[in-house]
Amino acid sequence: MRLLVLGSAAAEAVPGVFCRCRVCDTARREGGREIRSRTAYMLGDDIRVDFGHDAFWHTVRYGLDHTRLRHLLFTHSHGDHMDTPDLWYRKPGFCQVPDDAVLHIWGNEHVLRRGG
């Protein structure tokens, strides 16, 4: 199974929108690998760990097909790991997914309470 690191930054990402520290200035100047989106991972094509503010960007950047996603694991309920409004767009009327495409959501009680 392939592990793909989609992002590895904290909630503010790198470069931070309002930050002028050395790390963020270097990221702005050099770009490329210095630019870091918020933490998330893919395990194969059907398991995703965390679905934060950068989920759309990750999908475009890495050419992900989330109609194949079957398991979504939230490590915790902070917004940079759990951006639930984007999940609403998986419902009928917003997109078309195969009828048998069940998405299982995994997380602790705080995740399940927030997502409900």
Where are these regions (language model features)?
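Metallo-beta-lactamase
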Residues: V97-G116
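Generic structural hydrophobic/aromatic packing signal, biased to beta-strands
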Residues: L6, Y41-L43, I105
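Flexible, glycine-rich phosphate/dinucleotide-binding loops
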Residues: E12, K91, L112-R114
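Pre-active-site segment of Zn-dependent metallo-hydrolases
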Residues: P15-L73, S77, T84-C95
